[in-house]
Amino acid sequence: MNIDVEFHIRHNYPWNKLPANVRQSLGNSQREYEKQVVLYSIRNQLRYRNNLVKHVKKDERRYYEELLKYSRDHLMLYPYHLSDIMVKGLRITPFSYYTGIMEDIMNSEKSYDSLPNFTAADCLRLLGIGRNQYIDLMNQCRSSKKFFRRKTARDLLPIKPVEIAIEAWWVVQAGYITEDDIKICTLPEKCAVDKIIDSGPQLSGSLDYNVVHSLYNKGFIYLDVPISDDSCIAVPPLEGFVMNRVQGDYFETLLYKIFVSIDEHTNVAELANVLEIDLSLVKNAVSMYCRLGFAHKKGQVINLDQLHSSWKNVPSVNRLKSTLDPQKMLLSWDGGESRSPVQEASSATDTDTNSQEDPADTASVSSLSLSTGHTKRIAFLFDSTLTAFLMMGNLSPNLKSHAVTMFEVGKLSDESLDSFLIELEKVQSTGEGEAQRYFDHALTLRNTILFLRHNKDLVAQTAQPDQPNYGFPLDLLRCESLLGLDPATCSRVLNKNYTLLVSMAPLTNEIRPVSSCTPQHIGPAIPEVSSVWFKLYIYHVTGQGPPSLLLSKGTRLRKLPDIFQSYDRLLITSWGHDPGVVPTSNVLTMLNDALTHSAVLIQGHGLHGIGETVHVPFPFDETELQGEFTRVNMGVHKALQILRNRVDLQHLCGYVTMLNASSQLADRKLSDASDERGEPDLASGSDVNGSTESFEMVIEEATIDSATKQTSGATTEADWVPLELCFGIPLFSSELNRKVCRKIAAHGLCRKESLQNLLHSSRKLSLQVLNFVHSFQEGASILDIHTEPSFSSLLSQSSCADMGVPLPAKNLIFKDGVLSEWSGRSPSSLLIANLHLQ
């Protein structure tokens, strides 16, 4: 559906008020517009009243029936915000809705993975059917077909909900109750029903605990999970989340957007304002988190004196009591005492959206809480590679729930880091193979968290004189989740909550790094700095680097170019993927296959097997810039000296990978394992944009003892060239990680003056790299790389780059210290096509 059309439907524009261009896009057909109105309303589960669909579709009941059918067919979450209509009007409870969905997928013999993540989680909560139970049910269903008395899927499904968790602050509403229903109720149940019908909705905590569950199981009541404007929500590590698939419907997209944006110190109204999303939608999403048990309300949600005696020993109430400790509270309860509990806990869809409070008016309980509640944090940015390592390694029994939270929520907040660190501490080294790689990442992640979190040495000069300096809290943020927000929203979220961003290094090529001027970012300034282009930029400015050939998509090679003929191993990077080292002997077929899907960078890596790589951390200490060149004193290398003059390495951290292609180290080993882009010889050879062939992965021993390095033969400066420069804190090597963290503290990178210098140098580098990339685009004149372009040109180029890092329009070769256009001995695919036409 057209974005403009969606906008006008969302804002209830009738046909006669539509702009001419929108009418034209609909073929000037009012009937077409009305059809789009109904479709949009059903897809977004809009309420009939107060929306445009009311004026288009006259039959309200028919509309809700179609909405329910669409939701069920597309395996969407039950529309809890429409519970009053669904339960009272259509008599469809969440239990009957999910029973129908489960019956449909069983009859279609679909796998459990066909259920979207949140739908699967709600099915597990209400029906008690998870992956293993579903497989068991399908086996029973299939086996029954072989016998005379065949059981249908409906026969095998539960007839009533499993025991669900109900919080004391949830609101009990009367469902569709007939006289016959009342006859099968016990006396306490009848009294409860009478109270709800006569006095209106009741807090579940004010009724008998067992009666509430009994009435819910019978389908006589439904539950509202009320969220008010000033509610604050905490998201602990996920339990009971089902990782199946992402569907992409409106509500699921909203749930993921809010997941990564929410924090314990921002109330719902403020969050809606930051995200620029309708307040009622945000409340619906937060209500769903609480219903599924993925989040809980902070602060006083019910007066404990109002609790029915049957709730005293309920675990959720005991947890509630612990949250009422004033020292643990971050927000005051002022203003809530004058309202009745049910008014405070009014329906999530009907809460007044104009009751947003000024954050400045929200006083905290103590000065310590004030400091904690309003202190901006450091954000450590990671990608999905890290969560995969933590999930796949079976490193610690309870580590997986944290890893799932990091992946699905997209954030692990400072409040959860204590338990996360305890789990990381339990990780035991296996000492071999791929599992050792997972262990190394877990260990270095723990060290990095301990270094960045509440480290008073990092911010010694920025602390206020009248406040104790505890350093900054730390949140872990997944880049892919942040990129799910539009750039403006992402910027608002980051600016509101964080004082500094620090990236892991390297970030995978398969994502666009987060770009940020404020808060400052110790990491790639723009996506181009984390791409193939930056490699070529480094080679261009230093005049040094391995022989490299960047081929545009569609190019076809008849033979391997001459510059690679003497190499035994090549480093191959297909566009948007991480690199892999492959033998020269069988590379041509794979290259041509990859070139049909994407641009490819080919680089010489080793003349006698795999080349040797050494990672040189920066910023450089004074002692590292003195003395003679050796394997352990690479800071004096001429290329690094030039690089320090052209790129600000003193206010950023990271490492430069140096390559010795002629090295003949004896202690190499072959393995089918691989490391990430930080060590190209350990790089993953992921398939090339759908190609069935993937690059073979060959690895050398990741760590070479320093003494061994020094005695393994003489080396000269000429043997070594820069291969790659990565900004951020590396996680793939414990030794490198320790060195970089030490340098961050020693050079004061997180202090105010350094960050100010970083802002200027990052902008300058961004301008230079974008200008460099632009000079090799089709139709662009070759610009002087050494000139300083205007800031407006940066903006214009960045806007184009928002669609992705620009692809090469020309084939480029780096040879003998010079980067130039490559015509090649064999004609490109375009030229071949022209030859056939002649």
Curated annotation (Swiss-Prot):
Protein's GO biological process: intracellular protein transport; vesicle tethering to Golgi
PTM-bearing positions, type Phosphoserine: 332, 340, 671, 828
Subcellular location: Golgi apparatus, trans-Golgi network; Cytoplasmic vesicle
Compositionally skewed regions (Polar residues) per UniProt: 340-367
Region of interest (Disordered), residue spans: 334-367, 670-690
Compositionally biased spans, kind Basic and acidic residues: 670-680
Key words of the record: Cytoplasmic vesicle, Golgi apparatus, Phosphoprotein
Coiled coil: none
GO cellular component terms given for this protein: cytoplasmic vesicle; trans-Golgi network
Oligomeric form and interacting partners: Component of the complex WDR11 composed of C17orf75, FAM91A1 and WDR11; FAM91A1 and WDR11 are required for proper location of the complex. Interacts with golgins GOLGA1 and GOLGA4 and with TBC1D23; interaction with golgins may be mediated by TBC1D23 and interaction with TBC1D23 recruits TBC1D23 to AP-1-derived vesicles.
Protein family per UniProt: Belongs to the FAM91 family.
Role played: As component of the WDR11 complex acts together with TBC1D23 to facilitate the golgin-mediated capture of vesicles generated using AP-1.
Protein name: Protein FAM91A1
Organism lineage: Eukaryota, Metazoa, Chordata, Craniata, Vertebrata
